[in-house]
Amino acid sequence: MVMKKALLATLVVSGFMYGSFAYADTNTVAVGYAQSKVQDFKNIRGVNLHYRYEWDSPVSIIGSLTYMKGSESDSHKDNNSVEKGNADVKYYSLMAGPAYRINDYVSVYGLLGFAHSKIDVSINGTYLKKNGETVSHSANVNKKSTHIAYGAGVEVNPIQNLSLYAGYEGTSAKFNDNSHSINGFNIGIGYRF
């Protein structure tokens, strides 16, 4: 089901892009840095790609693809036991939406789409029994979550062929019946042609 939704979203955005190349007035391709804070986890970092198509109107279409990842380790020790854990998070989002050109230099945009998050957790521990025997245990948990993602931002064109953008991206992920917010930013530079 998740793959079907992702494939459908990709086809829709690809259709916009294909049509854009056929009748293109102005295109912008940009790449940038993305960083988000996952609730109850540390920051995840990655890359953001933007594509924008403008025609003879102040309203245009923009698409965004983001990939981020991060990992966190923790350990706990008391008198009789030691536990070590590691969590890896991967995040993907695909969004599209309208952009509005305020003047020759500044535009604002809004995005809506889907975000897919995956977490892999591994826990390893040892326990020392009273008789001196050591008992080891380990566990691995893999969870996935797909939710609606949203974003907004500003694009600046200081010169005709240069594009600078800064934006917000947000969603949530549900793992083990707990919802975790994911909020972050992306900044980038692009070429307008």
Predicted regions and their residues:
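Cleavable N-terminal export/targeting peptides
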Residues: 1-26
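Short glycine/proline- and aromatic-enriched beta-strand/turn motifs that initiate or cap beta-hairpins
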Residues: 20-74
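Residues that define the transmembrane beta-barrel architecture of outer-membrane proteins
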Residues: 25, 43-47, 88-92, 144-148, ...
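Repeated loop/turn-to-beta-strand initiation elements of outer-membrane beta-barrel proteins
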Residues: 27-29, 57-63, 105-108, 156, ...
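Transmembrane beta-strands of outer-membrane beta-barrel pores
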Residues: 33-37, 65-71, 90, 114-120, ...
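Residue-level signature of outer-membrane beta-barrel architecture
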Residues: 35, 53, 98-100, 114, ...
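Outer-membrane beta-barrel translocator domains and adjoining extracellular loop/strand segments
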Residues: 40-46, 72-82, 120-130, 175-183
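Outer-membrane beta-barrel "beta-signal"
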Residues: 156-157, 163, 181-193
